[in-house]
Amino acid sequence: MNKENVITLDNPVKRGEQVIEQVTLMKPSAGTLRGVSLAAVANSEVDALIKVLPRMTAPMLTEQEVAALELPDLVALAGKVVGFLSPNSVQ
């Protein structure tokens, strides 16, 4: 997995006794984005991110965990998601 796709959370997610300090984002396929507007994802709309991030994170975050993320962590994840939408020639 590409180390550039690993985000270290400023405020780790606590899941029971487990603490998630890093999240790896996997490049989405068309199916990953089903049910959300591509424009909404590209614009980093929170509702769209809450829907798609659980489908592309390892360990898999739940929608509730994504909704509870601190803003700097959500922005860091959103930046990677938007980066995946750009063609390789633009990156």
From Swiss-Prot:
- Biological process according to GO: viral tail assembly; viral translational frameshifting
Where do transmembrane segments lie in this chain?
A: none
A Pfam family (short name) is Phage_TAC_7
Which key words tag this protein in UniProt? Late protein, Viral release from host cell, Viral tail assembly
As for family, the record states: Belongs to the mulikevirus tail assembly protein family.
Q: What does this protein do?
A: Promotes tail assembly by creating a scaffold for the tail tube proteins. Tail assembly proteins E and E' would wrap the linear tape measure protein to create a tail assembly scaffold.
Name of the protein this chain belongs to: Tail assembly protein E
Q: What is the lineage of its organism?
A: Viruses, Duplodnaviria, Heunggongvirae, Uroviricota, Caudoviricetes
